[in-house]
């Protein structure tokens, strides 16, 4: 998939629900069901927003867990560190700085330290 367009990023930045989800996913990974429950948004809306944010490469799927009923549950975390939007010469440009990739062991250790 190509890089997200500046217009798509601006659309995301002006959507309160998407911003709330991004803030929620900044420090820890959650499933879509957990996002919907904790943020008190309809599950269908959470799925749509999470799907769009993943397509825009704003959040990242971190793991998939197979549940006892045989269904898979995906977990997500914020994938961006910084977004820069510029408007110059009647043109919009966008730069996204992704978070540094951390080894799963490092993330696991950080999870234990914060609990």
Roles of regions detected by a PLM:
Residues 14, 23-27:
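Short, locally clustered residues in the helix-turn-helix/winged-helix DNA-binding domain
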Residues 18, 43-44:
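The DNA-contacting recognition helix of HTH DNA-binding domains
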Residues 21, 34-38, 53:
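A short acidic, leucine-rich amphipathic alpha-helix
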Residues 57, 63:
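Glycine-centered, phosphate/nucleic-acid-interacting loop/turn motifs that mediate DNA/RNA or nucleotide
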Residues 81-115:
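Amphipathic alpha-helical dimerization/coiled-coil segments
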């Amino acid at each position: 998939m190509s890089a997200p367009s500046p217009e798509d990023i601006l659309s995301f930045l002006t959507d309160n629900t998407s911003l709330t989800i991004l803030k929620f996913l900044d420090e820890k990974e959650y499933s879509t069901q957990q996002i919907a429950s904790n943020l008190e948004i309809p599950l269908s809306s959470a799925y749509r927003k999470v799907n769009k944010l993943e397509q825009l490469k704003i959040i990242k799927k971190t793991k998939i867990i197979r549940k006892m009923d045989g269904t898979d549950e995906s977990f997500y975390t914020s994938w961006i560190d910084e977004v820069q939007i510029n408007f110059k010469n009647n043109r919009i440009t966008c730069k996204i700085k992704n978070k540094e990739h951390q080894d799963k062991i490092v993330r696991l250790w950080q999870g234990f330290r914060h609990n």
